[in-house]
Each structure stands twice: as C-alpha cells, then as structure tokens.
C-alpha cells in the first residue's frame, strides 16, 4: 500500500514539474520570436505619451504653469512625454 502511494505521488510530482517546464518553454519561445511587436505594450506606451503631452498643453492654454501629469509604473514625464525610467 505504501509503495503504491509513493509511486502515485512521485508520478504526480513529475507531471506537475513537466507541465510547469513546458509552460515556461512556451512563454520563452513567445518572447523570443523576432518580428512580432507587442501591440498591447506599444498601445500603452503611446497612451502614456499622449496623456502626458495633452495634459501639459491643456494647462498652458489656461495660462497656468504646466504641471506635468505623473506617469506611473516606472515612467516619468519629461519634455511633455512619458519616458521609461
């Protein structure tokens, strides 16, 4: 009985490790593919650039000092653009 239980648990552990390794390889292969732009990330970058520059332009029109919009997540506002820190 103990031997059967040990064998089942061993097989389950091997299966979990194999599945995890396969998922990691799949993720790495997707990241390593050349020529596939990450459209979601590009859209976020463009959105941050747009938000920061538009925010400053609106404040300038109201004759106020341009208080740059805070960029979050490792980005900062510089020259009316969000740039990666």
Curated annotation (Swiss-Prot):
Which PROSITE patterns does UniProt cross-reference here? Answer: HWTX_2
Molecular function GO labels: toxin activity
Q: What is its main location?
A: secreted
Expression by tissue: Expressed by the venom gland.
Q: Which cysteines are joined by disulfide bonds?
A: 52-66, 56-77, 71-82
Secreted keyword on record:
yes
Keyword annotations from UniProtKB, A to Z? Disulfide bond, Neurotoxin, Postsynaptic neurotoxin, Secreted, Signal, Toxin
Query: Where is this protein found?
Result: Secreted
Iron is among the record's keywords: no
Query: Mind telling me which GO cellular component terms the entry cites?
Result: extracellular region; host cell postsynaptic membrane
Q: Please list the residues that make up the propeptide.
A: 23-48
User: What residue stretch is flagged as signal peptide?
Assistant: 1-22
Task: Note the Pfam families from the entry.
Answer: Toxin_20
Family that this chain belongs to: Belongs to the neurotoxin 12 (Hwtx-2) family. 02 (Hwtx-2) subfamily.
* Protein's job: Postsynaptic neurotoxin.
By what name is this protein known? Answer: U4-theraphotoxin-Hhn1g
Q: What is the lineage of its organism?
A: Eukaryota, Metazoa, Ecdysozoa, Arthropoda, Chelicerata
